[in-house]
Amino acid sequence: MGQKVHPNGIRLGIVKPWNSTWFANTKEFADNLDSDFKVRQYLNKELAKASVSRIVIERPAKSIRVTIHTARPGIVIGKKGEDVEKLRKGVADIAGVPAQINIAEVRKPELDAKLVADSITSQLERRVMFRRAMKRAVQNAMRLGAKGIKVEVSGRLGGAEIARTEWYREGRVPLHTLRADIDYNTSEAHTTYGVIGVKVWIFKGEILGGMAAVEQPEKPAAQPKKQQRKGRK
């Protein structure tokens, strides 16, 4: 039976950046890894309704810097920054070093695999038909410029006695092409019949410059120059 490698893991260092970017010696490595896990667990619990896509952790000079990618930055920040200050203190307590929290907005949540998977799971928990939820997610992603998308759900679909897997795909999703920018993520819907797993693959195009092209900040689109019309004297 054929098995699939994790689409994000195989592309790390090729077209995908790491979610934790720090270096440590042998003594500190395990502690840093443990605190990273606990920080992510804490933030995902506190920001369960804030549409968090990914959490990036850096450790510059005995401190911790956390960047939260979210589709709803207002919920993370709170009134006058109260909520983000509470999060900063919580992260500092867990990590044991001074903490800094940055917020990055996800402009197109329909093209983010984690947010799409979470959206489908929330619909399944509200008893929306699974086929309708899948097709809606696929249509929204393709409408906003995805080159391809595949959505898979598995479990007791529609309350059936026997669990099964169903999937829906549109466009191209080339899993073997390493330069392909494929966003992959999973989520779980906890229904009265049991857990339903959701997997989402979104193909956004090919990255030809490798990591150098990924890490370059996007340049603003150049404004076309207006031609001056010469008036008659």
Swiss-Prot record:
GO terms for cellular component: cytosolic small ribosomal subunit. GO terms for molecular function: mRNA binding; rRNA binding; structural constituent of ribosome. Keywords: Ribonucleoprotein, Ribosomal protein, RNA-binding, rRNA-binding. It comes from the Bacteria. The gene is rpsC. Binds the lower part of the 30S subunit head. Binds mRNA in the 70S ribosome, positioning it for translation. InterPro entries: KH_dom (IPR004087), KH_dom-like_a/b (IPR015946), KH_dom_type_2 (IPR004044), KH_sf_prok-type (IPR009019), Ribosomal_S3_C_sf (IPR036419), Ribosomal_uS3_bac-typ (IPR005704), Ribosomal_uS3_C (IPR001351), Ribosomal_uS3_CS (IPR018280). Residues 39-107 form the KH type-2 domain. This is Small ribosomal subunit protein uS3. Belongs to the universal ribosomal protein uS3 family. It holds the Pfam family KH_2. One of its GO terms (biological process) is translation. It comes from Cronobacter sakazakii (strain ATCC BAA-894) (Enterobacter sakazakii). PROSITE patterns: KH_TYPE_2, RIBOSOMAL_S3. Part of the 30S ribosomal subunit. Forms a tight complex with proteins S10 and S14.
